[in-house]
Amino acid sequence: MKSIFVFGIGLLAATANVSADETVRYVALVNGGSAKAGHQWVTKGSDGTTTVDFDFKDNGRGPTLKEEYKLGADGTFVTYHVTGTSEIGAPVDESFAREGDKVHWKSTSDKGEQPVQGTALYTPLGGTPQGLSVAIAALANRVDGKLPLIPSGTLSFRKLADAEVSNGGATRQVQLVAITGIGFTPTTAWVTKDASPRLFAFIFPGFLQLIEEGYEKDGAALETQQKVAEKKLLGAMQERLAHPLAGTTLIRNARIFDSEKATLGAASDVLIENSRIISISDGGTEKRKAAHVIDAGGRVLLPGLFDMHAHFGPWDGGLHLAAGVTSIRDMGNNNETLQQFIAQEQSGALLAPHVIPAGFIEGDSPNAAQGGFVIKNLDEAKHAVDWYHEHGYPQVKIYNSFPKAILPDVTAYAHSKGMRVSGHIPVFLRAQDAVEDGYDEIQHINQVLLNFLVDDKTDTRTPERFYLPAEKVAGLDFDSKQVQDFIALLVRHKTVIDPTLTTFDFIRQRDGDMSQAYIAVADHVPPDVQRNWHVGTMKIPDDAAYARYQKSYEKMIDFTGRMYKAGIPLVAGTDAVAGFTLQRELELYVQAGITPAQALQIATYNGAKYARVLDDRGVIMQGKRADLILVDGDPTKDIADIRKVALVVKGDKAYYPSEIDEALGIKPFAQPVTVK
C-alpha cells in the first residue's frame, strides 16, 4: 500500500508557538484510529530553538526524522535542519538559512540560493507534517492571506469547519482549514483557534490520525466532520467540471479501438443514450438527431482505461479522469471510508472513476499494514471473506503478514464464494507456493521475482522486499530451468500478473535525479511537484550499487515481456500517483516488447475481464456502458499519445481533461474536444 507521507508536496516541515521548554506530543494512529503507528514530539527551548522528533511506521516501513530550527519575527525559518531516514531507508539531510535578503539551502536531492524580499517560507523536501504549524501561524499574520514560498509558490488557506474537543474535562476550540498552493490539491488540517494558531491534528480519512496526545478519543468525530467538509469541496469540483449528457449523444467520425482484438478500425459514428452505446455505424452515416454532438475529427476512440492497482483517495479522482482512467480497482483501503467513496461516486456526487473494490486481508504482526481486516486465525480470515462477499467485493487481496498455514483454506473458502484471490506473497512463502495454494493473481513484479531470491528466513514484511530484488534480479538467468519452470507454472494455472512496473522505478532513482517515471510529464506540473520528483527513497550507497539496481529494474521490465509472450495475462496497475503512472506503465510494457495496441488491450479489455465487469464495459460495442476516451494522435502506434486525452465520457457525463488539469495546476496535454 502506498504511503500518504509524500514530503514536500502535501506537507511542509517543523512547528512553532509553544512555550519555552514545553513539549507538545502527538500520536499517529492508523486504520481509523484503531492502531498506533508513531509519534511526533515538538519542543521549543529557552534559546528559541525548536526541535521535532518524528517517527512513523506502517507496513514495515516509514520515516524517522529529527528537525531543528529557529524562526524570525515574521514566523518563517531563519535556520532549519532535518536529518534521518525516508520511508524506505534513504538518508535525509537538509538545511536552510536566511541571511538578510539572501537564502540558501541544501538537501540530498537539491541545493540552491536566491534573493528574497520580505516574508517568505522555505518548504523542505524532507520535513515532517508538523510544518503546517509554521505555515499556518505565518499565514495568520499576513494581511493579504497569502504566504510566498521558497523556492517558489504561494500558500493560502480558508476555514472549512469548527469543532470542540476535550481532555480531562477541559475543552478547547479547533478549526478545519484547507491549505492550497502546494501540490495538486488542498491539504486539510485541524488547527487551534488562537492568536497564533498551530497544528492540532492532521487526518487522512481512513488511514491516518496524527492528533495531539490526550485527544485521541476526538479523532473519530473530527474525521467524520472532515469527510463532510471535504465532500462539499469535492462535490463543488464535480459540479464545475462534469458536463451532463442528457438525452442522446452522437460521437461522429471516431476511429474505434477494438479492445478484444487490439486493432484500430475506420471512422465510425457512435450513438449514446442513458449512459449506454445504442448503435455504431460507418462514419458520417448516422442520420438520427441527437441532443449533443461530438465531432471526433478522426481521433482514436478507446474504452476508458482501467487502473487495476489503486488505493483510492477522494482527491485522486481528477487525476484519474484527466488521464482517461474511468475505472479503478482499489487494492486496499479502510473499509468504511471506501464504502462511502463508492456510494458518492455511484450517486454522481464525486469527481471519480468507477471503483471496483478488492478486500484487504492482512495478518497480525509488528510489521502489519493496518487496513481492511487484520486477522490472527482462520475463523477471523473467513469472517473477513464473508464481509467482503456480502458487500459485493469480487476478490480479496492477501498481504505480507498473512499466516501461511491457513492460506490454502482461505483461498478455497473465497473460491467457494465465487471470489478471486490475489495479493502479495505471505512472508516465508514463495510465489510458486501461493499459486499452488490458490492465488489467481499476484501483485507487483518484486513479489513475482522474489520467488527466486528468498529462503525460509527472508522477512519480506520489511523493506528487504525492495532491496533484495534491487540487488539480485540483475544476476538472474531467465533462461534457467528454475525460471522456465516457474513461468510454465503460471501459464498452467492461468495466473494473472499485476506488475506495477512504474512504481518500482524508485529502486534505481538516485537522490537529485528526476524520476524517470514522470520525466515525460514534468514540464506540465507545478514546480513544487517537479522538485519532489527529484527525491529518491531508496538507499543507493555507491555507483556500483546504482548500476546493479538499474540493471535489476531493466530485467524486471524484460521479465514482464517474457511473461506476456508466454501467455500469462497482465493487468495494468499503478500503486502510485494517479493518472500519470498508468500512462507510464503502458510505455514500459512497450519497452518490454509488447506492442502499443496490446498494451492498450491490457489497460482496457484485460482490466474489465479480471475486474469482472466485461459484461458492462471495457469494449466499445452496442449495449455497453459509454465509458470512452478520445485521444489525439494514434496510441496504437505511439503509446506516448495516450497522454493526449482530449475528451472523457463516463456514462451520462463528459469531462474535458484540459479543464481538470487546469483546476489542478497542470498544463494541459491536449486541446479539448467539446460537446455541442
Stretch-by-stretch model annotation:
Residues 256, 261-302:
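Histidine-rich, glycine-flanked metal-binding segment
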Residues 62-130, 183-196, 200-212:
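Contiguous hydrophobic, core-forming segments of folded domains
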Residues 35, 89-175, 227-228:
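Solvent-exposed helix/loop surface patches that form functional interfaces
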Residues 384-402, 440, 448-592, 658, ...:
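Active-site neighborhoods of metal-dependent hydrolases
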Residues 212-253, 286, 294, 388, ...:
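Extracellular/periplasmic ectodomains of large secreted or surface enzymes and adhesion receptors
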Residues 166, 239-241, 256-269, 282, ...:
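Acidic, glycine-enriched loop/beta-strand segments at the rims
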Residues 317-337, 352-360, 389-402, 411, ...:
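Divalent metal-dependent hydrolysis catalytic cores, especially in the metallo-beta-lactamase
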